[in-house]
Design a protein with these regions (language model features):
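Acidic-basic catalytic patches of nuclease active cores, encompassing PD-(D/E)XK
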Residues: 2-67, 77-128, 232-235
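Short glycine/proline-enriched coil/turn segments at helix->beta-strand junctions
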Residues: 107-108, 167-171
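Short, contiguous strand/loop micro-motifs
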Residues: 101-102, 147-149, 170-171
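Non-catalytic C-terminal interaction segments of nucleic acid-processing enzymes
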Residues: 15-19, 47-48, 52-54, 68-86, ...
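Active-site-adjacent loop/helix micro-motif of nuclease/hydrolase catalytic cores
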Residues: 71-72, 143, 153-164, 175-176, ...
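A generic fold-level signal
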Residues: 55, 140-142
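Conserved catalytic cores of phosphodiester-cleaving nucleases, focusing on short active-site segments
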Residues: 60-68, 135, 143-152
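Nucleic-acid nuclease catalytic cores
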Residues: 152-155, 169-200
């Protein structure tokens, strides 16, 4: 099942940029139904159109995720804000974080209330004076986060944005109507994939796959896909 989320259908409190009419929108519109995407049959696919992230507004963020992993997510998870997920990613990376360490880095007041929210949402557990991440397969649902940056012309600009997208995505692609071999080679030096949508055919040069989560923004995108699915089901 594929669900497309844009500014008009986004969850409350989430910033999306309105998609403007023009040749780049036409390129993206044509690509979405023809998009080659392999995923497990029990996965859901949520396509975010121009979500607002710290690195910009990527044209598409495709999130492949397991609904079964969200079975115990509820209102406490919905109450989390991006800064909570920033602290969560820190604990996830450290595998163990003393509460005093979190206070030093994030501030005493925020560390206290954020860890309480994360604990209520079943993302972290407390043992003594240290916080530990809960089981990954119950806290992170995304198996793929694929960013797609579309452009007609301005190759350098689209390459730079695609490189920024590797901050949160497991794969980052450039979508263009046509591409040269030199441009493909340049992109692949940075692990960026290229998709050329030429009339009725699609040519793909694969992107390097990176493990998730890449950063706290991966957690933000992960939760955004889940939150968007709730709103979509309740419409």
């Amino acid at each position: 099942m594929r669900t497309i989320i844009d500014r008009d259908s986004a969850p409350d409190g989430v910033v999306f940029r309105r998609t403007l009419q023009g040749p780049e929108r036409e390129l993206v519109d044509a690509f979405i139904p023809a998009m080659p995407l392999v995923h497990a049959p029990d996965s859901r696919v949520t396509i975010l159109r121009e979500p607002g992230l710290e690195s910009g507004y990527p044209d598409l963020v495709i999130v492949v995720w397991r609904d079964s992993r969200t079975a115990n997510w509820g209102d406490a998870r919905l109450a989390l804000v991006p800064d909570d997920l920033r602290l969560m990613h820190y604990i996830f990376q450290r595998r163990r974080a003393d509460h005093s360490e979190l206070q030093d880095i994030f501030g005493s007041r925020f560390a206290r209330y954020s860890t309480e929210r994360l604990h209520d949402a079943r993302l972290v557990r407390l043992a003594g004076q240290a916080w530990f991440p809960c089981a990954f397969d119950r806290t992170f649902a995304a198996t793929k986060i694929i960013a797609v940056e579309a452009k007609i012309g301005k190759w350098t600009d689209v390459l730079n944005q695609a490189r920024l997208n590797t901050w949160f995505a497991s794969k980052s692609y450039i979508l263009v109507p046509r591409v040269s071999e030199d441009q493909v080679q340049e992109a692949q030096q940075f692990g960026i994939g290229v998709v050329a949508h030429e009339q009725d055919s699609i040519r793909e040069w694969d992107a390097r796959t990176e493990p998730l989560p890449r950063s706290y923004a991966s957690w933000v995108v992960n939760d955004l896909a889940w939150r968007a699915s709730i709103k979509h089901r309740n419409r």
